[in-house]
């Protein structure tokens, strides 16, 4: 088998739990050193896909490579080269930062544990907090500890499952700065997230719903492929206007964005014909470029729920 040039190069990945298909025929290619975003609603199959990639869960179908290794037959070797950060903080809260990292180094049977722990502490700016109990850390510092633990064995690929969920905006920004620094050094990332601003920080991204891959590419490519026409409406009586236009021919979504409405549709002819009678009601109508959130809401609303 020829070694793939991609860090992740898989196709046809499928997983079923009973009669339910939770990951359906997914293909993905992620380049070395790339930050690849994986988006989708809760229960869409993101975590299941990550767990199959790193060998924690056996796929029912699919083929391909992860870090040049057959992702189905060589999962034990893949685990040694991958760092996996789970959604839930899973470290010992009654141990210090340093003790937690030393414990992880022991699990990997590292011969130079002390040096590895020191490097992780320094890399994530935790030298001065090394003796602090993990249970007393803020959400942002807990995420730093989790990232440090993922890095301690010098992996080539990091799988981060909603790493900034529940973290304040500044901590999220700092966390992403660390990710970009690490990616610049050649580390590859596959990151699940719900946040549109985080999706925009990724080199490329994919969107999954109900186990099906609905879109992939750069932000610009995904937005263009969405094919949406979007109007931003500001002014008075927006709630009443929203009720009147919701459900009209060509109108796919009516969403409140702060003090404005975003109204979108794919069939431009039907869409504009339905909205024309309302454009002289005193509100301000501005045609804008559709954003990721507009596209993803549209994808979600048109996706078939095969989980029910």
Stretch-by-stretch model annotation:
Residues 177-266:
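ABC transporter nucleotide-binding domain
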């Amino acid at each position: 088998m020829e070694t793939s040039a991609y860090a992740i190069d898989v196709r046809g990945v499928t997983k079923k739990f009973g009669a339910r298909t939770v990951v359906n025929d997914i293909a993905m290619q992620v380049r070395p050193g790339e930050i690849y975003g994986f988006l989708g609603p809760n229960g869409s199959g993101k975590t299941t896909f990550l767990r199959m990639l790193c060998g924690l869960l056996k796929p029912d179908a699919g083929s391909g490579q992860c870090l040049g290794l057959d992702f189905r037959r060589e999962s034990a070797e893949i685990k040694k080269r991958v760092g996996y950060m789970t959604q839930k903080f899973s470290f010992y809260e009654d141990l210090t930062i340093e003790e937690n990292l030393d414990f992880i180094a022991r699990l990997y049977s590292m011969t130079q544990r002390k040096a590895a722990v020191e490097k992780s502490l320094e890399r994530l700016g935790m030298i001065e907090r090394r003796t602090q109990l993990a249970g007393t850390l803020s959400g942002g510092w807990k995420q730093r500890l989790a990232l440090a633990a993922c890095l301690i064995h010098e992996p080539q690929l990091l799988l981060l499952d909603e790493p900034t969920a529940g973290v304040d905006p500044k901590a999220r920004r700092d966390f992403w700065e660390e990710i970009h620094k690490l990616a610049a050094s050649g580390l590859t990332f596959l990151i699940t997230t719900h946040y549109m601003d985080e999706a925009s920080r990724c080199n490329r991204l994919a969107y999954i719903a109900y186990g099906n891959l609905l879109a992939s590419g750069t932000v610009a490519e995904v937005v263009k492929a969405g094919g949406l026409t979007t109007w931003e409406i500001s002014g008075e009586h927006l709630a009443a206007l929203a009720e009147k236009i919701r459900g009209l021919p060509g109108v796919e979504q009516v969403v409140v964005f702060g003090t404005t409405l975003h109204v979108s549709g794919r069939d431009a002819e039907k869409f504009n014909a339905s909205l024309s009678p309302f454009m002289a009601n005193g509100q301000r109508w501005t045609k804008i470029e559709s954003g990721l959130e507009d596209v993803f809401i549209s994808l979600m609303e048109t996706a078939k729920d095969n989980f029910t």
